[in-house]
C-alpha cells in the first residue's frame, strides 16, 4: 500500500482553505428573503445569517403582538433559507471532506 504524499495533502488542504474563504465572501453577498403575514413583514438575510433589512407594513403597527410574531416568523424563514443555501455552497467546496454544519456553527465567531 502506497503512503499518501504529505506535500500533495498539504496542497489540497491549502486549496480547500482558499476555496472556503471565497465561499464565505460569496455568502456575505448572497441574500435570502423571508416574509410573514402575506408579505406584511419582509426581511432579508445574507448567507452568513446576518439580518440586512426589515420592512413592516404600517397598517399593522397598531397590533404589537402580531408584529412581533410576524417579525419572528419572517426572520426565522429567511435564516432557514440562508442556512440551506450556505450548506449547499460549503458542500460544493468541501466535497465530503468536512461537514458543512460544523463550518456554519463557527462562521459567526
UniProtKB/Swiss-Prot annotation:
Signal peptide: none annotated. It is found in: Cytoplasm, Nucleoid. SUPFAM superfamilies: YbaB-like. GO terms for molecular function: DNA binding. Its main location: cytoplasm. Keywords: Cytoplasm, DNA-binding. Gene3D superfamilies: Nucleoid-associated protein YbaB-like domain. GO terms for cellular component: bacterial nucleoid; cytosol. Coiled coil: none annotated. Belongs to the YbaB/EbfC family. Binds to DNA and alters its conformation. May be involved in regulation of gene expression, nucleoid organization and DNA protection. Homodimer. PANTHER family: NUCLEOID-ASSOCIATED PROTEIN YBAB (PTHR33449:SF1). This is Nucleoid-associated protein Cvib_1034. It comes from Chlorobium phaeovibrioides (strain DSM 265 / 1930) (Prosthecochloris vibrioformis (strain DSM 265)). The lineage of its organism: Bacteria, Pseudomonadati, Chlorobiota, Chlorobiia, Chlorobiales.
